Structure formats: structure tokens, C-alpha cells
């Protein structure tokens, strides 16, 4: 029993956190349901298409970021394949978060195409770190705007477990970037694509909030969403479900001063666009899932793996 608990503790805690966050979200939706529906009607149809365009650009920018890292690491992959793998990873992250992560799908897909496992794995780790760096650049804006309402002790305590071994974390980071530290230009270009993705995301939020009659600074939106993103990295929920929406609604209500209905409406719309924009990945996913299943069969085999 203790072995089973140790193996599944993180998943169970995340499931419990997700369930709790979703319950709180449902209660909020029930309480503000009519107000939220009225708020949704204020969104302009043309802006729904503009946001769809921005999300399309955002997804392509994310694919370009990883493609640059792969190419500079010596992986001769065509952009079309990088794009397909990226969409497969996004779909798996959004729709299969408890079973197969998006990074696993990307890695297995790249290996299935015949590319080097070590380089692909390192490029995925570097891709994640560059994405985190991008959000980390604008997160201080969110902290500055919300400084008065943040419970600093609680905030710090929440992040301490991840920072208990900073030396080990630094070594892993340097090891991950060892290939690309000799090619700083590739890292910079990847970061530029991260900023393109972020501008599209923040622009989408800005459009929705403006439609709802609230005029908020673009940089305030950038800071508050980046802070929301960092909060969702705390492993208390699967893929940030519920937590992302509640955190953004809380920050928008208490920092910007908009109604909870506006905050939850915008958060729900952004989540919906994240889900919808990953749907192209379902076209390529079955072959990758089959490859993953075969790998699990081989790994479970009693024969030694060389």
C-alpha cells in the first residue's frame, strides 16, 4: 500500500486539487451564471475571429521556438514535422493530461521519425525553460501591480518546495542548455518566438476585456497573466484546470477592479481557445499513441534492454 501511495501520491494530490478547484469554479459559475451569460453577449463576433487568428499565430510561434532549438542542436527536421509534433503535444497536454503528457508525445514522435533521443529530449527541456523565461520576464509586472493584495508569506511558502535545491536546479539547467550555450543566437531567436506567442496571448485577453467595457493597460494584463501562469505551475492541479481560471479571476477582480463575471468569462474564453487551437493535433496523434503503447510493452518485457 505504501509503495502504491508513493508512486501515485502526486497524481492523487493533483486530482484532488483539480476537483476542488473545479468545484469552486462551478459554484462561482452558478452564483454568477446570469451575469456571465450577459457578459458573454457583449463579446463582438468579429473579435472572436481576431482572437482565433492571434491564437493561430501563437501556436505557430511555439512550434518555431522548438524547431529552432532542434535545428541548432543538429536535428535536421522539416518545419512541417515540427509543427505536427507541436500540435500533437498541445492536444495531449489539454486532453490527455493524466495519462500521456505533451512532452512525451513530442519525444516519442520525434524518435519515431528517426531523430536522436538525447538531443530531442534536451530540446524539449530547453523549450520549456525558454517559455518559462518569457513569462518570468513579465511576471514582475504582475507582482508589482498586485503587491498590496498578495499574501507574501503564503506566496513564498508555495514556491519554496521547488527552490529547496537551487544548486541542483542550476546544474540541470546548465546541462540542458549545454548544446545551445555555444549558439546564443538560437536561444535568442527562440526567445523572440516566445515573445510573439506572449504578445498574441496578451493581445487576445486585451481584446476580450476591452469588449466587456473595461479599459486595462496591456502591460497590466501581461503582468497579471504571467503571474497567473506561475501560480498554475504549483503542482496542485492537473494542467492548471480550475486553478488558472480562479487565480486570474481573483487577480482581475482585486487588482483591476472588474467584476468576477468579467474575470471568469475572459479566463474561460482563453481556456476554450487553448483547447480549440490544439485540436489539429488529433489528426496525427493515433500513430504516436500506438508507438507509446508498443514502447510500454517492450519496457514491461522481462528481457534485458541494451
What would you call each of these model-derived segments?
Residues 1-87, 135, 142-233, 258-306:
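Predominantly cytoplasmic-facing regulatory/coupling regions of multi-pass membrane proteins
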Residues 28, 98-99, 113, 180, ...:
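Histidine kinase transmitter module recognition
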Residues 67-70, 104-108, 246:
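Helix-loop junctions and terminal segments of transmembrane helices
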Residues 71-72, 94, 111-112, 210-211, ...:
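Transmembrane helix-loop junction
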Residues 89-98, 226-241, 245:
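Transmembrane alpha-helix interface/packing and boundary motifs in multi-pass membrane proteins
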Residues 96-132:
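Juxtamembrane loop-to-helix connectors within ABC transporter transmembrane domains
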Residues 103-104, 242-244, 283:
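Gly/Ser/Thr-rich beta-alpha loop segments that engage phosphate groups in nucleotides
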Residues 109-118, 246-262:
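Interfacial segments of multi-pass membrane proteins
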Amino acid at each position: 500500500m505504501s509503495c502504491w501511495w508513493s508512486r501515485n501520491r502526486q497524481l492523487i494530490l493533483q486530482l484532488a486539487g483539480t476537483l476542488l478547484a473545479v468545484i469552486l469554479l462551478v459554484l462561482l459559475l452558478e452564483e454568477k451564471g446570469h451575469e456571465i451569460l450577459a457578459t458573454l453577449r457583449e463579446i463582438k463576433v468579429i473579435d472572436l475571429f481576431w482572437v482565433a487568428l492571434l491564437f493561430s499565430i501563437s501556436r505557430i510561434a511555439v512550434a518555431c521556438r522548438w524547431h529552432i532549438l532542434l535545428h541548432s542542436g543538429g536535428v535536421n527536421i522539416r518545419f512541417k514535422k515540427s509543427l505536427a509534433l507541436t500540435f500533437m503535444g498541445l492536444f495531449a497536454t489539454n486532453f490527455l493530461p493524466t495519462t500521456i503528457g505533451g512532452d512525451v508525445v513530442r519525444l516519442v514522435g520525434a524518435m519515431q521519425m528517426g531523430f536522436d533521443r538525447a538531443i530531442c529530449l534536451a530540446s524539449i527541456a530547453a523549450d520549456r525553460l525558454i517559455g518559462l523565461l518569457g513569462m518570468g520576464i513579465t511576471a514582475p509586472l504582475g507582482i508589482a501591480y498586485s503587491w498590496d493584495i498578495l499574501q507574501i508569506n503564503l506566496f513564498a511558502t508555495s514556491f519554496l518546495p521547488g527552490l529547496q535545491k537551487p544548486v541542483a536546479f542550476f546544474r540541470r539547467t546548465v546541462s540542458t542548455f549545454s548544446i545551445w550555450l555555444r549558439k546564443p543566437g538560437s536561444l535568442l531567436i527562440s526567445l523572440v518566438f516566445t515573445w510573439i506567442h506572449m504578445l498574441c496571448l496578451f493581445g487576445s485577453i486585451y481584446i476580450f476585456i476591452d469588449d466587456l467595457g473595461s479599459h486595462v493597460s496591456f502591460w497590466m494584463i501581461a503582468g497579471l497573466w504571467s503571474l497567473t501562469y506561475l501560480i498554475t505551475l504549483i503542482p496542485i492541479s492537473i494542467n492548471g484546470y480550475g486553478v488558472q481560471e480562479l487565480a486570474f479571476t481573483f487577480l482581475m477582480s482585486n487588482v483591476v477592479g472588474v467584476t468576477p463575471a468579467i474575470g471568469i468569462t475572459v479566463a474561460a474564453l482563453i481556456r476554450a481557445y487553448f483547447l480549440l487551437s490544439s485540436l489539429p493535433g488529433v489528426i496525427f496523434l493515433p500513430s504516436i499513441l500506438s508507438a507509446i503503447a508498443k514502447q510500454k510493452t517492450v519496457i514491461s518485457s522481462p528481457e534485458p534492454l541494451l
